[in-house]
């Protein structure tokens, strides 16, 4: 399966679980519990990514990055952020990747 298709498919499933909850669904559980629970999971998974990277366990790191990615996608759906919005922002930033630090524009707002 194409890489983007896996991500798109997962995102679509997450959106579907928000719109049409299924009993026993972990994704549905997260949406039911709300933003605070979702943010807690994003924080936990972020910490687990850091620990796995520090332990230099590549397989565990891959698994933790997948967990974090999933929870970030749940957060995106909760906050009504689409994948194409992220893609557009990354595309804008890609233009700056090769710039040297002194060549970058000053950030005017955060």
Swiss-Prot record:
InterPro entries reported in the protein's UniProt record: HisE (IPR008179), PRib-ATP_PPHydrolase-like (IPR021130)
Catalytic activity: 1-(5-phospho-beta-D-ribosyl)-ATP + H2O = 1-(5-phospho-beta-D-ribosyl)-5'-AMP + diphosphate + H(+)
Pathway: Amino-acid biosynthesis; L-histidine biosynthesis; L-histidine from 5-phospho-alpha-D-ribose 1-diphosphate: step 2/9
Major localization listed first in the record, in broad terms: cytoplasm
Gene3D superfamilies: MazG-like
Pfam families: PRA-PH
Its EC number(s): 3.6.1.31
Annotated signal peptide: none
Keywords carried by this UniProt record: Amino-acid biosynthesis, ATP-binding, Cytoplasm, Histidine biosynthesis, Hydrolase, Nucleotide-binding
UniProt GO cellular component terms: cytoplasm
One GO BP annotation of this record: L-histidine biosynthetic process
EC class name: hydrolase
An example molecular function term from Gene Ontology annotations: ATP binding
Subcellular location: Cytoplasm
Family of the protein in this entry: Belongs to the PRA-PH family.
HAMAP family: HisE (MF_01020)
Protein name: Phosphoribosyl-ATP pyrophosphatase
Species assigned in the record: Clostridium botulinum (strain Okra / Type B1)
Lineage summary: Bacteria, Bacillati, Bacillota, Clostridia, Eubacteriales
Name of the encoding gene: hisE
């Amino acid at each position: 399966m194409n890489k983007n298709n896996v991500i798109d498919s997962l995102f679509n499933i997450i959106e579907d679980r928000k719109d049409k909850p299924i009993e026993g669904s972990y994704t549905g559980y997260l949406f039911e519990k709300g933003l605070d629970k979702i943010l807690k999971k994003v924080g936990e998974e972020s910490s687990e990514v850091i620990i796995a990277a520090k332990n230099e366990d590549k397989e565990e790191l891959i698994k933790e990055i997948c967990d974090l990615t999933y929870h970030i996608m749940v957060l995106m759906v909760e906050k009504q952020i689409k994948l194409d919005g992220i893609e557009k922002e990354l595309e804008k930033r890609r233009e700056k990747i090769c710039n040297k630090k002194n060549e970058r524009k000053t950030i005017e707002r955060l």
